């Protein structure tokens, strides 16, 4: 028992030291975004819109991708004062032909792709056995398959130029699973694993990958009811502008992983890694009837047409 206790404490201390070193170590910018060509999926609202502003303010050439052309045109007008060139491509990234068209039109316009931001995503909540199978399939296709396939399509031009950056927008739930979000968590675990694996595969090729792990965020995917509920547990709900700025800053610094969501999010990730039983107990306490009811309501609303970011 004493050995087990010492092992657990040693693991927790080692994990804490690792995150402290990652947080405080000096970093040096390696990427200048001026005139770089940046594709952003899910760019019509929420975090995607905030990312468009963050890149535009750094004078990047921004390619806006989402399903709704009218919303994309609104974002285009908003960011045009900051950047020399904006390309709008209405597309359903769950479709192979649309993904190919995004890459083809970008290369036809700019001749290269410097940065790919896989941001588009959909979510749903509630008990897994009650979730709509069509919605689950769409989530797998948008959150995971589309990011992998679009990355596969842009890699040839990046590898040919020995230069490229891929920014994958994951979730803190990719490192610390939460009940009532089983399919969504599965897609984010998959995206995190894909990012980690591909980063090692592309070592020394000039192509770099960064994974962003946001916490709860003010977007169309989070209702006021959920915001109020998670706030009672002491979890911050961050603004997309803050998340976008931190993501772009981490990208230009060459960071591999950017963890957001406050101290509790970091503690949750550490607990998942070094004390999973403790985290399981915590989630059992969280699973109040009110939490289950709220998540079930979200799942029903999403099944009737929840939005993509």
What feature does the model see in each segment?
Residues 171:
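Residue(s) in the substrate-gating loop at a strand-loop-helix junction
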Residues 69-70, 91-101, 133:
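The beta1-alpha1 cofactor-binding region of Rossmann-like NAD(H)/NADP(H)-dependent oxidoreductases
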Residues 58-74:
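Conserved glycine-rich Rossmann-like NAD(P)H-binding loop of the short-chain dehydrogenase/reductase
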Residues 44-45:
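Conserved glycine-rich cofactor-binding loop
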Residues 151, 187:
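Active-site helix of classical SDR
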Residues 211, 231-269:
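C-terminal helical subdomain
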Residues 127-128, 132-137:
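Substrate-binding pocket helix/loop in short-chain dehydrogenase/reductase
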